[in-house]
């Protein structure tokens, strides 16, 4: 039987594409543009897994489709190659992280090329290349000049095992680090911060302008966390000190019975009484060991200590005890809250625990039993009594402003971005600190500030990066003799990925980040595909940098990525025992369609789970390509289900995709291909062209492949295949299975040219119309025959055709036909006696 020999065909076409630079980005100014971007990978030692090609295949299908439609297509690939794993590996083995990274990149590139993706490799970038990070550093100097990069002494999330501080976004809900799962503690350190908060409102508002999944927009909205309320100033009794509280409910001020400061609040030490000093100091020490997430966990027991001081409630002059508690964060709002225990669950639990006063100021509920958190008419609130929420807030804000103790305020949950890392393997921050107390950015002509090669890359332990050990690099002298030290912190891995999509547009430019005309031509990115796990971090940071570059006049668009799509996760096959515990695949015996634990004999339940080394269910694409071919892997991953669904890997599904490609190969290479069109496949072909075109546009790749299967089934029923339909079908197939597409195109055309730029087929609407219909013929209401007749045949003609049919002739022989009822396009009913 004829089959598709992937081992011969696929390498042949990969070599052809490379030798001919088939996918070089188009530059014809008269054509429309299409920029298809993948989230570039971190080149890990493990190499590519089968989850990577899912998103890559989707952008590749779109890129191949758009080239055939006459677009200039920019479809690049590169490497997000700084980061902790390479550094950790280097420390464990004594090897240079740059060598390790280069080896990993070579392996990734080999694997990617084996899958037939149409990348323009002339545009390959690597975030660890000094010619690339020169511009990462240049962007940092611009942030510094604009006052958007600054140094601050801040409590950081310190991970002793990693020897570095990490951003809030990198701390898991259980208070451990995202990388490594190590304990995170809070400690104050001098850090570089980026003022992303200056862009909070624009980052929020401009989400309306992009075509992104609503779930991702919501995650960003929640992270930015805009709330409108009021700042209220509270005086500390018997002192000249005061503090400010931000509240979204200034209308409940009459119910504020105590105040809580963050343990780190600047006022704490100066207002604490002698009697309470020891308890306060001990509480502060304990709080410093916890991460923000651990401190604000709603489920944890409320703890706190009274300072011994009182605040004065400005609205009624009542004394409010001032406490410190770790659930209030110095970095959020003003680091102080007014507690209204009658109407806030956390305040209520705290008040009950420490026997503090609870005064209801909204009608409804029983505050002895629980906090009442619904809306209600105001009570116990003097001039607000009888008002609803909106009216009461407005009236209280006016009162606060008239009496000078507060004002309306918009607040954001978003914090400034902690940008420095105490590691070696990252971009050096281009700042010099001089002994006269000033700091300056390294001038543009001296960039890149190259990361020095060193064997000693262990964290210094002092909170500085290993660069602090390299005195030759570290110490500099100005022309006027003033000595200085280079900044020893490096940038986080997020830096290089915050702007990489811009460098693809002009990757070899050594004069500027990218040429302005080229940026204008290619931006924004038309489709960006990657995992939803980057919803907040990477996507928010990239939008922030893009807006800064927009303000600097570097980029012409407000937003970088016009359309975003998150592919689902490919899950591995896994097995669970009766307790629900997962069992590694090498401990499972398959018998008669059931699964058993090899050691215990227990029958196991098959269940999809995330692929992991421990479960031994990670599928390596190299193995799939070797056994089934790259086109099979591509078609299978696109046919598994909707692109955004998470679906379990299945060997049977892979075999099904392979069988389909073999059927296609046989159809085109063994069927008689003819120059005359019999018309038999008109409807099937034009339906397929229309459906596949629409489904690729809508990224419904699974239904597009289903439609290709329908055409193959229809074509196999015919003796001959019209050459134009054979060619058109191969063109529709090519974005999904490009190696097979090229091979079959040559067998049909012998052109020696790639199929890549052949104009995409179009459908003819008139061919979609049915010219024939099937009607039933009944005798006394029972179906006796089915006929295919011309559509809209008249009653008289229909009657003639029905009565002339062999079966009907036999049925009515010797009988008298009383009546014939003919309904065009439906049926003929014959009444006999």
Curated annotation (Swiss-Prot):
- Give the UniProt record's GO annotations in the biological process aspect: leucyl-tRNA aminoacylation
| Assigned EC number | 6.1.1.4
Reaction(s) catalysed (UniProt annotation): tRNA(Leu) + L-leucine + ATP = L-leucyl-tRNA(Leu) + AMP + diphosphate
Sorted keywords for this record are:
Aminoacyl-tRNA synthetase, ATP-binding, Cytoplasm, Ligase, Nucleotide-binding, Protein biosynthesis
- The name on file for this protein is Leucine--tRNA ligase
**Name of the gene:** leuS
- Where, by residue number, is the motif 'HIGH' region? 41-52
Protein localization: Cytoplasm
Please tell me the species this chain comes from.
Answer: Streptococcus equi subsp. zooepidemicus (strain H70)
Instruction: Check the record and name the InterPro entries matching this protein.
Output: aa-tRNA-synth_I_CS, aa-tRNA-synth_Ia, Leu-tRNA-ligase, Leu_tRNA-synth_edit, M/V/L/I-tRNA-synth_anticd-bd, Methionyl/Leucyl_tRNA_Synth, Rossmann-like_a/b/a_fold, tRNAsynth_Ia_anticodon-bd
Tell me which family the UniProt entry assigns to this protein.
Belongs to the class-I aminoacyl-tRNA synthetase family.
MF terms (GO), sorted A to Z: aminoacyl-tRNA deacylase activity; ATP binding; leucine-tRNA ligase activity
Q: Where is this motif: 'KMSKS' region?
A: 610-614
Cellular component terms per the entry's GO annotation: cytosol
- Please give one Pfam family short name: tRNA-synt_1
């Amino acid at each position: 039987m004829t089959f598709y020999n992937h081992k011969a065909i696929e390498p042949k076409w990969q070599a052809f594409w490379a030798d001919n630079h088939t996918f070089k980005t188009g530059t014809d100014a008269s054509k429309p543009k299409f920029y298809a971007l993948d989230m570039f990978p971190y080149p890990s030692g493990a190499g590519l897994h089968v989850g990577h090609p899912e998103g890559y295949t989707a952008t590749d299908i779109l890129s191949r489709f758009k080239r055939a439609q006459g677009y200039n297509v920019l479809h690049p690939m590169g490497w997000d190659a700084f980061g902790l794993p390479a550094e950790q590996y280097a420390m464990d083995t004594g090897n240079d992280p740059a060598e390790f990274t280069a080896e990993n990149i070579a392996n990734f590139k080999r694997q990617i090329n084996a899958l037939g993706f149409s990348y323009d490799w002339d545009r390959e970038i690597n975030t660890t290349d000094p010619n690339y990070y020169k511009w990462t550093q240049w962007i940092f100097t611009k942030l510094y000049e604009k006052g958007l990069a600054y140094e601050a002494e801040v409590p950081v999330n310190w991970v002793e095992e990693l020897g570095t501080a990490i951003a809030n976004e990198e701390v898991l809900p259980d208070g451990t680090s995202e990388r490594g799962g190590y304990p995170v503690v809070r400690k104050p350190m001098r850090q570089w911060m980026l003022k992303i908060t200056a862009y909070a409102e624009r980052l929020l508002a401009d989400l309306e302008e992009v075509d992104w999944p609503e779930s991702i927009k919501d995650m960003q909205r929640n992270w930015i966390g805009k709330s409108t309320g009021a700042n209220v100033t509270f005086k500390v009794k018997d002192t000249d000190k005061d503090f400010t509280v931000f509240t979204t409910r200034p209308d409940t001020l009459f119910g504020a019975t105590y105040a809580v400061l963050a343990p780190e609040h600047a006022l704490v030490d100066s207002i604490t009484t002698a009697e309470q000093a020891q308890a306060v100091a001990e509480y502060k020490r304990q709080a410093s060991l916890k991460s923000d997430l651990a401190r604000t966990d709603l489920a944890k027991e409320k703890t706190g200590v009274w300072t011994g001081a009182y605040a004065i409630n400005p609205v009624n002059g009542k004394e409010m005890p001032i406490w410190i508690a770790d659930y209030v964060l110095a970095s959020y709002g003003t680091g102080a809250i007014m507690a209204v225990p009658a109407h806030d669950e956390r305040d209520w639990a705290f008040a009950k625990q420490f026997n503090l006063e609870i005064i209801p100021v909204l009608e409804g509920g029983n505050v002895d039993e629980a906090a009442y958190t619904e809306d209600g008419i105001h009570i116990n609130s003097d001039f607000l009594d009888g008002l609803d929420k909106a009216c009461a807030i407005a009236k209280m804000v006016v009162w606060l402003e008239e009496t000078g103790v507060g004002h309306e305020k918009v607040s954001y949950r978003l914090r400034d971005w902690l940008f420095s890392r105490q590691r070696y393997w990252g971009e050096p921050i281009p700042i010099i600190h001089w002994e006269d107390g000033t700091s300056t950015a390294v001038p543009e002509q001296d960039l890149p500030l190259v990361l020095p090669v060193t064997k000693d890359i262990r964290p210094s332990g002092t909170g500085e990066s290993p660069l602090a050990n390299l005195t030759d690099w570290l110490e500099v002298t100005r022309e006027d003799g003033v000595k200085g030290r280079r900044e020893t912190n490096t940038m986080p891995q997020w830096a290089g990925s915050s702007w990489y999509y811009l460098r693809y547009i002009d990757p070899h430019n050594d004069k500027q980040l990218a040429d302005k005309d080229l940026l204008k031509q290619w931006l924004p990115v038309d489709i960006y595909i990657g995992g939803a796990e980057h919803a907040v971090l990477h996507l928010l940071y990239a939008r922030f940098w893009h807006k800064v570059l927009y303000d600097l006049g570097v980029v012409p668009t407000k937003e970088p990525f016009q359309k975003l799509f998150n592919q689902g996760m490919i899950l591995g096959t896994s097995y669970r025992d009766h307790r629900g515990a997962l069992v590694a695949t090498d401990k499972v015996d398959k018998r008669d369609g059931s699964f058993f634990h090899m050691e215990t004999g227990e029958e196991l339940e098959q269940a999809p789970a995330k692929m992991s080394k421990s479960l031994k269910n990670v599928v390596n694409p190299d193995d799939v390509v070797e056994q089934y071919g790259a086109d099979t892997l591509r078609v299978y991953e696109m046919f598994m289900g909707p692109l955004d669904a998470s679906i379990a890997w299945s060997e049977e599904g892979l075999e099904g995709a392979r069988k389909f490609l073999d059927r296609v190969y046989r159809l085109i290479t063994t069927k008689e291909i003819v120059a005359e069109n019999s018309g038999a496949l008109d409807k099937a072909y034009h339906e397929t062209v229309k459906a596949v075109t629409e489904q690729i546009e809508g990224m419904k790749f699974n239904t597009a492949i289903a439609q290709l299967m329908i055409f193959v089934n229809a074509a196999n029923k015919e003796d001959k295949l019209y050459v134009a339909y054979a060619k058109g079908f191969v063109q529709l197939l090519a974005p999904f299975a490009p190696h097979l597409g090229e091979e079959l195109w040559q067998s049909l055309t012998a052109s020696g040219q790639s199929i890549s730029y052949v104009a995409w087929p179009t459908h003819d609407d008139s061919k979609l119309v049915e010219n024939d219909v099937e009607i039933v013929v009944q005798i006394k209401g029972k179906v006796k025959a089915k006929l295919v007749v011309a559509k809209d045949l008249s009653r008289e003609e229909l009657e003639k055709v029905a009565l002339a049919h062999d079966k009907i002739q036999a049925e009515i022989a010797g009988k008298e036909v009383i009546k014939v009822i003919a309904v065009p396009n439906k049926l003929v009913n014959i009444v006999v006696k």
